[in-house]
Amino acid sequence: MTLNLCVLTPNRIVWDSEVKEIILSTNSGQIGVLPNHAPIATAVDIGILRIRLLKDQWLTMALMGGFARINNNEITVLVNDAEKGSDIDPQEAQQTLEIAEANLNKAEGKRQTIEANLALRRARTRVEAINVIS
């Protein structure tokens, strides 16, 4: 038995295929989803989506927050942005992380600090999506 996973952003369909299992980052921690999972709707945190493909290979995806619905072996993940780990340029991601860290260090005031922290979380997630060992 398999799951049908659909990952959507406002601009495109990132993934729409059958999978064996996923591990999803939610606002209350990671959840694993196997076939016949109980129905659930949950907020999706900035984090990694791990997808176990039908050939037992693992694929990673960086998700930038949103929500997910699981029902009758159908998983729909709606997020602000998503990138497959294999599509992320490692050098660009590392540079973005370094810039985000520098921006956090020089942030002044609450608003700049919050925005810099959010940018740093996004940058770390992109780097993590590249470096996850399958």
Curated annotation (Swiss-Prot):
Q: Which InterPro entries match?
A: ATP_synth_F1_dsu/esu (IPR001469), ATP_synth_F1_dsu/esu_N (IPR020546), ATP_synth_F1_esu_C (IPR020547), ATPsynth_dsu/esu_N (IPR036771)
Q: What is this protein called?
A: ATP synthase epsilon chain, chloroplastic
Subunit arrangement? F-type ATPases have 2 components, CF(1) - the catalytic core - and CF(0) - the membrane proton channel. CF(1) has five subunits: alpha(3), beta(3), gamma(1), delta(1), epsilon(1). CF(0) has three main subunits: a, b and c.
Which UniProt keywords are given for this protein, alphabetically ordered?
A: ATP synthesis, CF(1), Chloroplast, Hydrogen ion transport, Ion transport, Membrane, Plastid, Thylakoid, Transport
* Keyword Hydrolase attached: no
Task: Give the main location.
Answer: plastid
GO MF terms on file? ATP binding; proton-transporting ATP synthase activity, rotational mechanism
Instruction: Look up and give the organism this protein is from.
Output: Glycine max
Q: Which domain of life is it from?
A: Eukaryota
Any single biological process term in GO: proton motive force-driven ATP synthesis
Its membrane topology: Peripheral membrane protein
Question: What family is it from?
Answer: Belongs to the ATPase epsilon chain family.
